[in-house]
Amino acid sequence: MTDRYAVFGNPISHSKSPFIHGQFAAPTQESLTYEAILAPVDGFEASLTAFFNAGGKGANVTVPFKEQAFALCDSISPEAKLAGAVNTLSLLADGTIRGDNTDGLGLVADLIANLGSLQDQRVLLIGAGGAARGCILPLLNAGIAQLTISNRTHTKAQLLVDIFTSVDNGAYVSKVTAVEMSELAGEFDIIINSTSASLAGELPPLPAHIITTQTVCYDMMYGASVTAFNQWALSQGAAKVIDGLGMLVGQAAKSFTLWRGIEPDTQVVLTLLRDKLMAEPK
């Protein structure tokens, strides 16, 4: 019997998830289908319920439904709890729905694939939205030394720190701080841009001095060409820049493992996806 999976969003036609999961399944002989489902903005719950009632086993969730999906879960992972959102839903044997957030896990997996280790790294996280919130715990669990969060609106960055502090057991509280962009000082080993500014060709208002010849810069956005943030980072002398395509594949791989119990080969799929992206009409 073929198991059904899907990704829900609005819009959704641009989604690369069906291609990614199809590539994950092919070498494993896993019998499954994976489709993109356009859910009405006011009809996500009904669409999801219909999918599960028709035999769906699991689903990914993207904009704008991640918070709604969180509210529908019977159980959630620690990462999802802190993120306040889920991107992966699993229908369990007892009929309940488990929610996970694999976005931050995908980011960490891609960083480790590129850098080898995150142990004792000093990380600056730009942005304080859902993408940033979902990455805090995975980054800390990876062994980083400190996490500085900075956002155009400082109160949002501080709120993110406060939310984390309220749910943390005390092990990481001293490692997480919020700093205004204009007051950023010192050196960072890794700078992560979680904002969508690059999609509009824009940049967060960051001081150039925070980038050194040792700094690795990571933009969660991606495209056929170098993103605006990564172009700026290179112009300031960054040691290395990485875009978010590997994070996309990484979070999908974590979802696939949750559903199927198999760890897919992400590097092969990332290469295929990069080639596919480069071949798309500009």
Swiss-Prot record:
Its EC number is 1.1.1.25. This is Shikimate dehydrogenase (NADP(+)). The active site is at K66. GO terms for cellular component: cytosol. GO terms for biological process: amino acid biosynthetic process; aromatic amino acid family biosynthetic process; chorismate biosynthetic process; shikimate metabolic process. GO terms for molecular function: NADP binding; shikimate 3-dehydrogenase (NADP+) activity. It is an enzyme of class 1 (oxidoreductase). The keyword Oxidoreductase applies. It holds the Pfam family Shikimate_DH. Keywords: Amino-acid biosynthesis, Aromatic amino acid biosynthesis, NADP, Oxidoreductase. Pathway: Metabolic intermediate biosynthesis; chorismate biosynthesis; chorismate from D-erythrose 4-phosphate and phosphoenolpyruvate: step 4/7. Shikimate binds at S15, K16, S17, T62, N87, D103, Y222. Homodimer. It catalyses: shikimate + NADP(+) = 3-dehydroshikimate + NADPH + H(+). Gene3D superfamilies: Leucine Dehydrogenase, chain A, domain 1, NAD(P)-binding Rossmann-like Domain. InterPro entries: Aminoacid_DH-like_N_sf, NAD(P)-bd_dom_sf, SDH_C, Shikimate_DH, Shikimate_DH-bd_N, Shikimate_DH_fam, Shikm_DH/Glu-tRNA_Rdtase. Involved in the biosynthesis of the chorismate, which leads to the biosynthesis of aromatic amino acids. Catalyzes the reversible NADPH linked reduction of 3-dehydroshikimate (DHSA) to yield shikimate (SA). It comes from the Bacteria. NADP(+) binds at G127, A128, G129, G130, A131, N151, R152, T153, H154, T155, K156, M220, G244. Belongs to the shikimate dehydrogenase family.
